[in-house]
């Protein structure tokens, strides 16, 4: 029951031969700068993919803390874990991870209501034109979850066979997980504790060495995983940062862990809209990773701190533990591979964590890079890779911006998001509210497909039932849609009966 949308195919499967070196000298040497989530994923992916054909050096300051809000992921993380030979159960046992079945949007229409955006769709094979979902909307019985059903999400249950057949991912503690992953590979990686301060380049502009306080490190290929610092990429020439703050103006996050004993553990990440942004709530086994995202264009830092403190008091009976605020830039590098250097994760760009796309992007980058790279740098590969990554970000920003298209106008922030919509959002909204999208609406590699846009549109209450009904009748698929809908409900009922409480499920691992 793999999602056709969250998980991209990797042409090389486990157990296949290791790619031979294109030269007879020493193994090709990758130097990864950064040891956070992105650095850990990249270095272990490279080693798992190429084995002894490569040497992977990871350099980072071991004393520097990561952001550590708590990572909400997509099923792409399961693809990564399979590649590097780590079981999801390991992260649950040792890193406070929990199961994630989707996302809960709360108060995005301003009335306190909520809707779910789950991952896969059991109806996908037949529902490529959205017929089953449209039938459910017309008849008032569509619950936005074509896989498990809202009962499982509302009651925080997990199918007992989730690891074998389910479409799922994890909520993780990013700090613990990156340490765990690197420790698993400590005998296969060269891990160095140092602070990188500069680089040297050859006459072609390629990096020769990265320079740290303790030493200099040469390599064949360098990867910038330094997060918001963008340490290597800021020193490269002929690149530009594409600012997307006109689409997504949020530029601050207030992190605050909530330590409490769970009576029950949610199976969804909650994104709760406020009058000037939204609050992220990621359930881990030992805490809730929370963060308040807002824009300084519409509220001051102090106002945001005060509002977040009130929210924590009212919802969790606790107070804001610090006044730490993390600034960020909404945007991405036009080119994310230049010469013999690539940027990954937050070094390559930032999208607010509404749909957990940042870690997804790291893994997608590694899939694309390792599938096309054979230890020799060609401009053709660079150009194609960069175009793929620009397209990725374009699709992400389109979907994230569409999530704000709920019609709220109860504050200056929401008036801006509603009245100052980009033209692409206007035309998309006009289309999908009257006529459903299909598999041909977006490129096949797109991270978000027709089903995702449909679920958000329905969650916002913007689907036109009369128009949908007429389309089903005109296409002559009403009876077929009804039959498929009924079959899907039976299957969801079966899955529900084989599910148990999330907290109880975690305790069995």
Segments from the language model and where they lie:
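Low-complexity, highly charged intrinsically disordered N-terminal segments
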Residues: 114-180, 184-185, 193, 225, ...
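Conserved FAD/dinucleotide-binding core of flavoprotein oxidoreductases
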Residues: 274-327, 349-360, 375-378
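Dinucleotide-binding Rossmann-like beta1-alpha1 core, especially the glycine-rich loop
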Residues: 65-154
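Conserved mid-domain beta->alpha element of the FAD-binding
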Residues: 331-396
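Predominantly flavin-linked oxidoreductase catalytic cores and closely associated redox partners
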Residues: 166-304, 366
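Long, low-complexity C-terminal extensions of enzymes
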Residues: 371-509
């Amino acid at each position: 029951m793999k999602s056709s949308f969250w998980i991209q195919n990797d042409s090389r499967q486990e157990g296949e031969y290791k790619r031979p070196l294109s030269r007879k000298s020493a193994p090709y040497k990758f130097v990864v700068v950064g040891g956070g989530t992105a650095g850990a994923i990249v270095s272990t992916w490279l080693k798992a993919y190429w084995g002894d054909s490569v040497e992977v050096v990871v350099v980072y300051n071991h004393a520097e803390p990561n952001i550590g809000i708590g990572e909400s992921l997509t099923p792409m993380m399961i693809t990564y874990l399979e590649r590097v030979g780590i079981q999801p159960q390991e992260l649950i046992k040792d890193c406070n991870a929990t199961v994630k079945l989707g996302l809960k949007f709360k108060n995005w229409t301003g009335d306190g209501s909520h809707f779910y955006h789950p991952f896969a769709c059991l109806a996908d094979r037949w529902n490529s034109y959205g017929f089953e979902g449209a039938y459910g909307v017309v008849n008032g019985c569509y619950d936005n979850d074509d896989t498990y059903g809202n009962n499982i999400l509302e009651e925080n249950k997990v199918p007992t066979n989730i690891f074998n057949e389910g479409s799922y991912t994890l909520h993780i503690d990013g700090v613990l997980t990156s340490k765990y992953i690197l420790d698993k590979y400590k005998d296969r990686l060269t891990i160095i504790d140092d602070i990188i301060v500069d680089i040297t380049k050859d006459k072609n502009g390629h990096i020769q060495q990265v320079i740290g306080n303790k030493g200099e490190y040469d390599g064949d290929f360098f990867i910038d995983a330094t997060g918001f610092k963008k340490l290597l990429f800021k020193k490269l020439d002929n690149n530009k940062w594409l600012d997307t703050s006109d689409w997504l103006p949020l530029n601050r996050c207030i992190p605050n862990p909530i330590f409490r004993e769970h009576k029950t553990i949610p199976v969804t990440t909650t994104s709760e809209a406020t009058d000037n942004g939204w609050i992220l709530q990621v359930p881990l086994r030992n805490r809730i990773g929370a963060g308040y995202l807002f824009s300084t264009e519409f509220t001051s830092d102090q106002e945001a701190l005060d509002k977040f403190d009130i929210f924590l008091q009212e919802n969790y009976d606790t107070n804001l533990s610090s006044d730490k605020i993390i600034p960020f830039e909404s945007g991405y590098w036009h080119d994310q591979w230049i010469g013999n250097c690539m940027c990954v994760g937050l070094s390559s760009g930032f999208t607010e964590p509404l749909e957990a796309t940042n870690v997804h992007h790291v893994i997608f980058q590694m899939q694309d890079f390792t599938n096309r790279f054979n230890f020799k740098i060609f401009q053709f590969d660079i150009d194609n890779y960069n175009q793929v990554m620009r397209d990725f970000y374009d699709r992400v920003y389109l979907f994230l911006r569409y999530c704000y298209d709920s019609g709220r106008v109860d504050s200056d922030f929401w008036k801006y998001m509603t009245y100052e919509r980009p033209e692409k959002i206007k035309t998309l909204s006009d289309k999908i509210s009257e006529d459903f999208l299909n598999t041909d609406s977006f490129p096949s590699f797109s991270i978000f497909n027709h089903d995702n846009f449909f679920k958000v549109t329905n969650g916002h209450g913007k689907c036109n039932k009369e128009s949908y009904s007429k389309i089903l009748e005109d296409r002559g698929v009403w009876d077929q849609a009804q039959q498929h809908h009924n079959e899907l409900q039976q299957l969801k009922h079966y899955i529900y009966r084989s599910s148990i409480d999330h907290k109880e499920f975690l305790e069995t691992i």
